[in-house]
From Swiss-Prot:
Family: Belongs to the SIS family. GmhA subfamily.
The EC number(s) this enzyme carries: 5.3.1.28
Cofactor: Zn(2+)
Pfam name, any one: SIS_2
Source lineage: Bacteria, Pseudomonadati, Pseudomonadota, Gammaproteobacteria, Legionellales
Name of the encoding gene: gmhA
Gene3D superfamilies: Glucose-6-phosphate isomerase like protein, domain 1
Organism: Coxiella burnetii (strain RSA 493 / Nine Mile phase I)
Keywords attached to this entry: Carbohydrate metabolism, Cytoplasm, Isomerase, Metal-binding, Zinc
Domain of life: Bacteria
Name of protein: Phosphoheptose isomerase
Keyword Metal-binding included in the entry's annotation: yes
Length: 199
């Protein structure tokens, strides 16, 4: 396979993954978007976390909330727990990397808030501890996962929502997570900003 064929292959595999996800994920995406919109309407906030590319996804979501998505609107309260290098490195140094998100949630999370937890594998210890911390604080969890959901799946409660991409490839999962994040932003805007219905 030459490089031109490889690029075409990657596009085709990404399309296949998204196509397979349509029937499986529309319902949980809508449920999660509505849950997030209600959270914001009730004057609560959304915290997000992930590692590596998933950390970038967490920041992507929070930036769309704080700035705007495709509609002019007020800022919505959202915070990526991945961005404060001083806090993350202090917790990792003094305690452990597994606690870099959970300790922030213990200080920042409140009942009625939502945690957006992003993990392609579902096995990241700091994400697992973040979910446990969120539950202790009375928060609901929206989890973006892939593969078989990993250990993360076993921690979710009946009021939590998992959006699991039906793929094994980390790249394909992350590409679909980006689309899911845009879908969530679109739902939130349409629920909270009537003028967004026109776009």
């Amino acid at each position: 396979m030459n490089l031109f064929q490889r690029v075409k292959y990657n596009f085709e595999e990404s399309i296949k993954t998204k196509t397979a996800a349509i029937e499986l994920l529309v319902d949980p995406i809508v449920q999660a978007g509505e849950l997030m919109a209600q959270c914001l309407l009730n004057e609560h906030k959304i915290l997000s976390c992930g590692n590596g590319g998933s950390a970038a996804d967490a920041q992507h979501f929070s930036s769309e909330m704080l700035n705007r998505f495709e509609t002019e609107r007020p800022s919505f309260p959202a915070l990526a727990l991945t961005t404060d290098a001083s806090t993350v490195t202090a917790i990792a140094n003094d305690y452990s990397y597994a606690e870099v998100f959970s300790k922030q949630i213990a200080g920042l999370g409140s009942t009625g808030d939502i945690l957006l937890a992003i993990s392609t594998s579902g096995h990241s210890k700091n994400i697992l501890q973040a979910i446990t911390a969120a539950h202790i604080r009375g928060m609901n969890v929206v989890a973006l996962t892939g593969r078989d959901g990993g250990e993360l799946f076993t921690l979710l409660g009946t009021d939590d929502i998992e959006i699991r991409v039906p793929a094994e490839s980390t790249a394909r999962i992350q590409e679909t997570h980006a689309l899911i994040i845009h879908c969530l932003c679109d739902i939130i805007d349409r629920k909270l900003i009537p003028s967004s219905e026109d776009h």
